[in-house]
Amino acid sequence: MVKLVVGIGNPGRQYVWTRHNIGFLLLDSLASRFLGAFREAPRLYASFAKVEISSEAVVLMKPTTYVNLTGKAVLAAKKFFDVSMEDILVVADDINREFGFVRFRQDCGSGGHNGIKNTTQILQSNHYWQLRLGVGRPSYPGAEGVADYVLSSFSLNEKEKLNDFLEKGIEEILPWLGC
């Protein structure tokens, strides 16, 4: 049995430290902790690392599609690794929660997150797990403001707290991973 953990984010150096890429950042931390190294898998539209956690095979995946097209990569990996819906976890930013908030649950909606919407649409189900990481909401109104906000870098204050925040997210999912 294999578990699939998908971080939502955008490919490219310019997005590495943005709020929208917090899913990638958590996977980088998880891979480092369990000695995994990411490698490209163009057929899966992603880079991935295979790790073993408590004798369980876990695939960590960072799609190379953009956030709004995440579902294509999740479906390709689901088929390739023969993963059940219950063994899929998607890690995403959440602008509806303050920075530092962590929520882990199954069978839930998108909360307006386009990557989650696309994943649910492509999988034709929301029966997968989500780890939502609060990144806060912009202080300026409008959809354009939201897009600019999630594509902007963390504030200095947030950067100082980021490692602890990522660790909090990892601790939340370790029981699901078998630890």
From Swiss-Prot:
InterPro entries to which the protein is assigned, alphabetical: Pept_tRNA_hydro, Pept_tRNA_hydro_CS, Pept_tRNA_hydro_sf
SUPFAM superfamilies, per the entry: Peptidyl-tRNA hydrolase-like (SSF53178)
Signal peptide (residue range): none
Reaction it catalyzes: an N-acyl-L-alpha-aminoacyl-tRNA + H2O = an N-acyl-L-amino acid + a tRNA + H(+)
Keywords: Cytoplasm, Hydrolase, RNA-binding, tRNA-binding
Active-site residue list: H20
Enzyme class: hydrolase
Primary location group: cytoplasm
GO biological process terms on file: protein quality control for misfolded or incompletely synthesized proteins; rescue of stalled ribosome
Residues annotated as binding tRNA: Y15, Y66, N68, N114
EC number: 3.1.1.29
Site (Stabilizes the basic form of H active site to accept a proton) location in chain: D93
Compartment(s) of residence: Cytoplasm
Assembly and binders: Monomer.
Summary of the function given for this chain in its UniProt record: Hydrolyzes ribosome-free peptidyl-tRNAs (with 1 or more amino acids incorporated), which drop off the ribosome during protein synthesis, or as a result of ribosome stalling. Catalyzes the release of premature peptidyl moieties from peptidyl-tRNA molecules trapped in stalled 50S ribosomal subunits, and thus maintains levels of free tRNAs and 50S ribosomes.
Family: Belongs to the PTH family.
Annotated PANTHER family: PEPTIDYL-TRNA HYDROLASE
Protein's recorded name: Peptidyl-tRNA hydrolase
Source species of the chain: Chlamydia trachomatis serovar D (strain ATCC VR-885 / DSM 19411 / UW-3/Cx)
